[in-house]
């Protein structure tokens, strides 16, 4: 299986309370089909953080993976920017 075909997202960590799991908020701007206004859509993903290295506020890149639990289908690829 090619790893290149897996989706990646960049988002902000909003929760790190679970062991080896983070919650990542991904924001996306889409144009309304009729009115053309840019609308912000947000979605939360649970991602696997093997080393428990992420903290709230970090910008991270996550990648699709096989299902790891009931809700977890993403894994941490890299920390783009640490929280200030």
UniProtKB/Swiss-Prot annotation:
PROSITE patterns associated with the record: RIBOSOMAL_S17
GO terms under biological process: translation
Pfam families: Ribosomal_S17
Superkingdom to which the source organism belongs: Bacteria
GO molecular function, one term: structural constituent of ribosome
UniProt entry keywords in alphabetical sequence: Ribonucleoprotein, Ribosomal protein, RNA-binding, rRNA-binding
Entry's Gene Ontology cellular component terms: cytosolic small ribosomal subunit
Assigned protein family: Belongs to the universal ribosomal protein uS17 family.
Task of the protein: One of the primary rRNA binding proteins, it binds specifically to the 5'-end of 16S ribosomal RNA.
Subunit structure: Part of the 30S ribosomal subunit.
Name the UniProt record assigns to this protein: Small ribosomal subunit protein uS17
Organism in which the protein naturally occurs: Alkaliphilus oremlandii (strain OhILAs) (Clostridium oremlandii (strain OhILAs))
